[in-house]
Amino acid sequence: MVYAQNYAELLQTHIDSEADITLLYQSVDNAREEFINCDILNLNKQKGVESIEKNRGSAQKRNIFMDTYIMKKELFIELIKKARKISSMYTLPQIVNSLAGELDIRGVAHRGFFASITDFNSYYNANISLIDFKTADALFNPDWPIYTRTNDSCPTQYLEGASVKNSVISNGCLI
């Protein structure tokens, strides 16, 4: 998942709601074609999480779970222990889903750029979407820098005859 989020605000929302667990999600209107096999949240009208399931492409509008949880450490440890008793293959979303009827689990909508990288096609599409300045501006905010780029490699070299349009080029490339 690629997105920018102010976690202090998200934590405060969690504290104010007094929920046991808060999950971050992005509402999308292209889930039939995109986000296949990503987890989705089924919410009630109060944004309470009723279940977590896989997106099978059966509906256009879905709430894509962004794999972001907020809960107390003690609850997290308890969930891990419960999951381990069931199976070593049991995942955190599965144990949270199994307890959705017992715990107060809330969903909080994310606003802004969001990309789910699940295969080469989604990786390509996410990168190409960042060519648009408005899209890139939604992710790359000077007040919230993203530190992912190394600064010790040589810049890209554009050799004679190179023609580049609508491309995302990493440093250290020869074109």
Which role does the model predict for each range below?
Residues 74, 82-175:
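Left-handed beta-helix
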Residues 5-83:
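Conserved core of the sugar-phosphate nucleotidyltransferase
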